[in-house]
From Swiss-Prot:
Cofactor binding description: PSII binds multiple chlorophylls, carotenoids and specific lipids.
Lumenal side: 1-11
Function: Involved in the binding and/or turnover of quinones at the Q(B) site of photosystem II (PSII). PSII is a light-driven water plastoquinone oxidoreductase, using light energy to abstract electrons from H(2)O, generating a proton gradient subsequently used for ATP formation.
Keyword vocabulary terms for this entry: Membrane, Photosynthesis, Photosystem II, Thylakoid, Transmembrane, Transmembrane helix
Keyword Thylakoid: yes
Protein name from the UniProt record: Photosystem II reaction center protein X
Organism of this sequence: Thermostichus vulcanus
C-alpha cells in the first residue's frame, strides 16, 4: 500500500510544481510586457 500513495504524492508534487512554474512564467511575461509598453 506504500507504492500507490507514494506515486500519488509524487504526481501531486509534480503537478503542483508545474502549476507554480506556469504561474511564475505568466507573471514574468506580464511584467515584461508591461515594461515594454511603458518604454514605448
Amino acid at each position: 500500500t506504500i507504492t500507490p500513495s507514494l506515486k500519488g504524492f509524487f504526481i501531486g508534487l509534480l503537478s503542483g510544481a508545474v502549476v507554480l512554474g506556469l504561474t511564475f512564467a505568466v507573471l514574468i511575461a506580464i511584467s515584461q510586457i508591461d515594461k515594454v509598453q511603458r518604454s514605448l
